[in-house]
Amino acid sequence: MQKTLEIILSALKEQGQPLDANALDRIIRARNRELRGPVRAVAKKKLLPFYQQVKENDPALWRSWNIDDALESLLVRTLRMKPMRTASGVATVTVLTKPWPCASACLYCPNDIRMPKSYLTDEPACQRAERNWFDPYLQVALRLRTLADMGHTTDKVELIVLGGTWTDYPRKYRFWFMRELFRALNEAADAKAQHASITERRAFYERCNIRNERDDLAAFSRDEQTRVTCGELTYNQAVRDLYGANEGWRQASACQTATLSDVSREHARNVQAAHRSVGLVIETRPDCITPGALTEMRALGATKVQIGIQSLDQQILDANLRRISLDRIARAFELARLFGFKIHAHFMANLYGATPKRDVEGYRALVTDGRFLPDEVKMYPCALVDGTGLVAHWRDGSWKPYTEGELIDVLVANMQVTPPYVRVSRMIRDISSHDIMTGNKKVNLRQMVDEELARRGAAVAEIRTREIGTRGTDLSDLALAEFPYETTVSSERFLQWVTPDGKIAGFLRLSLPKADAIAAARTEAENERGLIGERGRKAMPPESEDASHQAERDIAPTSADAQSELAAQDAFPLSAGEAMIREVHVYGAVAALGHASTGAQHTGLGRKLVARACDIAREAGYERINVISAVGTREYYASLGFEQHGLYQQKKL
């Protein structure tokens, strides 16, 4: 390994630029031929971890290579695995909450009792979570290590918290989960401290006799899973039996508690940490979005909500047992927008009762009706998974998957109507083909859609298609464009830096709330607080009362302290006359904080976007402007004149 690395370093010194994939492959293949081993002794994925190990543990050898910052940058860019993982400008870390009863029972939703509702064991993020006992600290710490070994910079991290419905979990568990996410980020710069924490946490779960090996977990859940798949048990009943009544899980759950003050302390550390949270995403259902729930999410540091919409056709929603009205979905969008959250909607084609025509009409409504208008969309086809209620409809012929042509036509039509301020993040779920009984199993579905769009000569305006990615950026080529649009509660301005060919190097989402919408939301928040106060659950939204929660609720009860921690907050944290910056994002390969980048970041583009947003808000008559800053971006916005103001940072105009 050492000789291979030295050959690469020599080539980099000679070329003065990163090696392309072919040149690197030739070096690796030549070394493997020299070694003549039974297996490949040298592989790209092993080289960067080896280099980092030498740098940390063998300083004499590392110094002998005469590596300066410029050469190290070339080496990392040459050996980085999957460079697109951080091309959007941020290193993403996805974590899952533990299996837990769900207050809903949708027809198509998977019932894998080893996972939180709707997720499947073989999905990559799920595998990582299960190996780490669904522990947030372990998931973050080990994922950061993996990304670093792959050559990715991890000082700016977006945390994505998945697991069905966030507010279905006990509040003290939610606080603990967030505290541990931030603690993992805060300790990541101290390898010894983090190693000690990882070792201690693993030992704790082992003392609780909770297994994390694949075969053991399969055996642990086999009988109950069979009964769930056959319809003898519900998902909630099985989760109660497996986890709520299990002594090991009860012991672990008893320790999975924290207060909001605990979270706030980790937030304070993260403001100037080496690994900062620049975004925090929480997944929930639209019927769980209330002023109180959003206030708590904001207090925990969240900046984006993922909402499972699935359809905007009431008949289809009812047929799939969604148990929600379009008016309730619309109100979820309105409230999330007023609170400043980015809105990431899940939209599913080919549900029971759907047709290609109805799917296209529903998606068009999602991106054109002012009651909705998400910022980001996961747009994927319904997958038939064993053990779901949809299986019976497939067997009796009342549901069948779209043909490949029908599905591509739907997705192509949807892409063509997607506005320039919307990012289509996904077109498939990470579901293994062996879990899909019928329907689309092609992992390159998006590529197929892109190829069909190109064949038709169709114009596509959505963000992901236009992202500048890892390519270099000539600032003189960029122009600032503005795209205005209206929602039922605000006037929105999407500001974007674009190249002459329409590529996007950065953008800002500015919301100009309507005064009557702010007043209505304040009244709703005060009414919600009053109702909760009457039930002795001051200042927060009600927990789900599903009976199957009770076994584990007894493990981690919601104390009076946890109920009242947010009581000091205003019922509604916003006022009329305040504009809101909901997102600022600059693309390009992630640059380490304080280091140079060849991409679009750290070029003043973000500052100019914020300055223009302030001008627009001032001209529109707003007196102040808020920003829904992540914990790790507070310092940046402070440098632009924003001050901490309750749950947001604010600047007078």
Task: Say what each PLM segment does.
Residues 1-139, 143-258, 420:
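Flexible, acidic/Gly-rich N-terminal and inter-domain linker regions that tether
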Residues 122-139, 159, 163-183, 194-344, ...:
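Conserved non-cysteine loop/helix-boundary elements of the Radical SAM core domain that shape
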Residues 185-186, 252-255, 288, 292-298, ...:
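C-terminal scaffold of the Radical SAM
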Residues 519-571:
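Intrinsically disordered, low-complexity terminal tails and inter-domain linkers enriched
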Residues 597-616:
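Conserved acetyl-CoA-binding loop-helix of GNAT-fold acetyltransferases
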Residues 616-629:
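Conserved GNAT acetyl-CoA-binding A-motif
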Residues 629-648:
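Conserved active-site alpha-helix within GNAT-family acetyltransferase domains
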